[in-house]
Amino acid sequence: MITYLKINGFKSFHNFEVSFTPLTVIAGINASGKSNLFDALSLLSRLAEVDNIKKAFKEQHGEFIELFTQLDRDVYAQEIEFCVEMLVNRTIKDAWGNKAPLRYTCLRYELTIRRQTNSSGIEDLVVVAEHLENLKHLEDNWVKQIPKETLRDWRPEVKTGKKVYLICLQKQKMLCQLYLCRKMVCQAIDGASHSIIRRERC
């Protein structure tokens, strides 16, 4: 389940932030950005599922350049940035069907994708930053809304306060399988599609 989402450089979103509850209703007039929010979730889900960035972009509506925020006529943002805070299942299954319990169930995932020209003079898409870490209680605004008596139902108690970095491509530091991390992200995003209701307002 997604608890917080920040988007920058995707379609109409510029430093856009939204917090989610177990049931969230998105209401607004036509062309207010509701569809763009679901398009962003769709892109995030595909990016977590596939290894080919271009494939994930091509599956979206329109040309890939149109997914970047248009700043002026024929001028588009160079980067798309996502920041997702999520509550994931307490167990994860790997590619071989093995299950393992998770120590941390509240995570923050950050992803930055940039447009750049490759050596052949063709515009390409590259991941310039990818970061996944656990959220401490003090950093998790969503968990502050949960009554203390039911807090353990949402996230297990962790006695250590040391932050664990699960993915950090900027430092080329890998402390767990990228497959599992992306699968957790994908599960959280897919779960969000069932808990968010979109409504048109006249």
Label the predicted regions.
Residues 95-202:
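Electropositive, glycine-dotted interaction segments
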Residues 39-108, 115-118:
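Conserved P-loop NTP-binding catalytic core
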Residues 8, 21, 85-89, 112-116, ...:
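Solvent-exposed residues in well-ordered beta-strands and their adjoining turns
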Residues 15-21:
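Phosphate-binding P-loop
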Residues 34:
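Conserved lysine of the Walker
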Residues 1-14:
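N-terminal pre-Walker A segment at the start of P-loop NTPase domains
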Residues 26-28:
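Hydrophobic anchor at the beta1->P-loop junction of P-loop NTPases
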Residues 6, 22-23, 156:
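A structural signal for the main folded, soluble domain(s) of proteins
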